[in-house]
């Protein structure tokens, strides 16, 4: 675990809070959740949605996307300055699904962004409530992480698609703030930095002038965020080198890719938060639950309890398996896309299978899909146990891993051995140990070589019964390590396209 000296807890990042005690943090996170809930209730009223339609996850996604778009200032400004055919920069909308005469119908709605902003602020006591917006972004990001494998994006930046366990938060928008930065994986940060360096290589003016100064500040800030995720001195020292480079170029890209690979064994600290769709918070608020008074945490038992008592529905395409659709959303809700499947299965109480074996496509329905054959079903989002979400990468050791994904990034603080395929990973480290970072590289490679399989991560941490709210009696599960643990194993998941 990185030291907690100057760091704020996630919940503080989540609510832009200064230092608060646990009760205050729980209250401010609760306030954020109830704001989302109140907004959702109001939108369902505006759109005249029935209770069932309001609990449909596709409707929830459209409503969430509308409010995020209404508050996306940079894009709104861009749209006004570059008017494109048939797109009104002042309006936002999307598909809303209603049940008409025993069939699901798609209705495209359009609203003034100003009106959406008004409803959102009203639900949040007049505030912009950016924390709530970021929360929804992280939920969308977690859903993307579970649904898509970022092979193409990885290959484009010169990284290995098998490093997908480092890509948490790769679709988060830049404006997602400190809370967003906390949940980004090492690979995501590396990819953002490489894109930046490549622009600098291709565009002479990228680092120059007033704009270039801003660019440089952003570059150094991103380097510091990434540095803060690493848990070993050598990795951090190498990040200092990358950050201080006068003119970032191919040498820095090499260093970053080296660091990303090293993170498969010497894992970084990446935060995990359970962010649920707005259609979970809405009905809870409507039923009279006072999140602010009761308090709420994104990393404890609260999201599990909430899902335990929630009814969420989803549209299902003709050849999809509703149980598989449920697994996809369960993983997204618990931020578990890169967790060891054996751990997820134990906590969920039903087997969690790799992405390639799921008979389901993403949750969103494209505008050209035929609605006549659409059914809907209940998503099973309950769990057998609960566990605390981690923000450390755990310590490092070795197990069998797979062709498609050669390491994992833990979500739950549960005692276990962490799987990774050492031979495959180490094979990438042959040769190139010269240059100015050679001593650090040698040190990092040595640490990776010495990573022991028998070391246990999260000593003594276990899972808890749902009745054990105080986490008093940990159950330390034993896992069958002969089974496959990677989700994106030899995978055929769809690609994420903006």
Curated annotation (Swiss-Prot):
Protein's GO biological process: symbiont entry into host cell; viral penetration into host nucleus
Name of protein: Nucleoprotein
Region (Disordered): 1-21
UniProt-annotated location(s): Virion; Host nucleus
Function: Encapsidates the negative strand viral RNA, protecting it from nucleases. The encapsidated genomic RNA is termed the ribonucleoprotein (RNP) and serves as template for transcription and replication. The RNP needs to be localized in the host nucleus to start an infectious cycle, but is too large to diffuse through the nuclear pore complex. NP comprises at least 2 nuclear localization signals that are responsible for the active RNP import into the nucleus through cellular importin alpha/beta pathway.
Keyword RNA-binding annotated: yes
Sequence motif Unconventional nuclear localization signal, residues: 1-18
Matching HAMAP family: INFV_NCAP (MF_04070)
UniProt motif (Bipartite nuclear localization signal) ranges: 198-216
């Amino acid at each position: 675990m990185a030291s907690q000296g100057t760091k704020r807890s996630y919940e503080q990042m989540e609510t832009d809070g200064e230092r608060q005690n646990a009760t205050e943090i729980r209250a401010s996170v609760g306030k954020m959740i109830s704001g989302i809930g109140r907004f959702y209730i109001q939108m369902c009223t505006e759109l005249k949605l029935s209770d069932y339609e309001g609990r449909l996850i596709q409707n929830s996604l459209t409503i969430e996307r509308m409010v995020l778009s209404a508050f996306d200032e940079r894009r709104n400004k861009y749209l006004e300055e570059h008017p494109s055919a048939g797109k009104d920069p002042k309006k936002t909308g999307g598909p809303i699904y209603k049940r008409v005469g025993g069939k699901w119908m798609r209705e495209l709605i359009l609203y003034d962004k100003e009106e959406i902003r008004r409803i959102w602020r009203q639900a949040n006591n007049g505030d912009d409530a950016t924390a709530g917006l970021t929360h929804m972004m992280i939920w969308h990001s977690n859903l993307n992480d579970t649904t898509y494998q970022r092979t193409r994006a990885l290959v484009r930046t010169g990284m290995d698609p098998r490093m997908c366990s480092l890509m948490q938060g790769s679709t988060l928008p830049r404006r997602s703030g400190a809370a967003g930065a906390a949940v980004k994986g090492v690979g995501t940060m590396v990819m953002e930095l490489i894109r930046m360096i490549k622009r600098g290589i291709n565009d002479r003016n990228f680092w120059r002038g007033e704009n270039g100064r801003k660019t440089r500040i952003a570059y150094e800030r991103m380097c510091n965020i990434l540095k803060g995720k690493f848990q070993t001195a050598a990795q951090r020292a190498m990040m200092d080198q990358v950050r201080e480079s006068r003119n970032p170029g191919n040498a820095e890209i090499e260093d970053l890719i080296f660091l990303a690979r090293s993170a498969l064994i010497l894992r970084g600290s990446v935060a995990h938060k359970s962010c649920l769709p707005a259609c979970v918070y809405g009905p809870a608020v409507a039923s009279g639950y006072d999140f602010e008074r009761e308090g709420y945490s994104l990393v404890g038992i609260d999201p599990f309890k909430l899902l335990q008592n929630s009814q969420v529905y989803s549209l299902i395409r003709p050849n999809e398996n509703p149980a598989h659709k449920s697994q996809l959303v369960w993983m997204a809700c618990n931020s578990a896309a890169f967790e060891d499947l054996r751990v997820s299965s134990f906590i969920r109480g039903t087997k969690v299978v790799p992405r390639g074996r799921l008979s389901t496509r993403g949750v969103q329905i494209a505008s050209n899909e035929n609605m006549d054959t659409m059914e809907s079903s209940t998503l099973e989002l309950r769990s057998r146990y609960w566990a605390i979400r981690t923000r450390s990468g755990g310590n490092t050791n070795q197990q069998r891993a797979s062709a498609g994904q050669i390491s994992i990034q833990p979500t739950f603080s549960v005692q276990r051995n962490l799987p990774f395929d050492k031979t495959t990973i180490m094979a990438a480290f042959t040769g190139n140990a010269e240059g100015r970072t050679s001593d650090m590289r040698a040190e990092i490679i040595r640490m990776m070589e010495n990573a022991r399989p028998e070391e246990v991560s999260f000593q003594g941490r276990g899972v808890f019964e749902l009745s054990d709210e105080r986490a008093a009696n940990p159950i330390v599960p034993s896992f069958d390590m002969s089974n496959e643990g990677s989700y994106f194993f030899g995978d055929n998941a769809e690609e994420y396209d903006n």
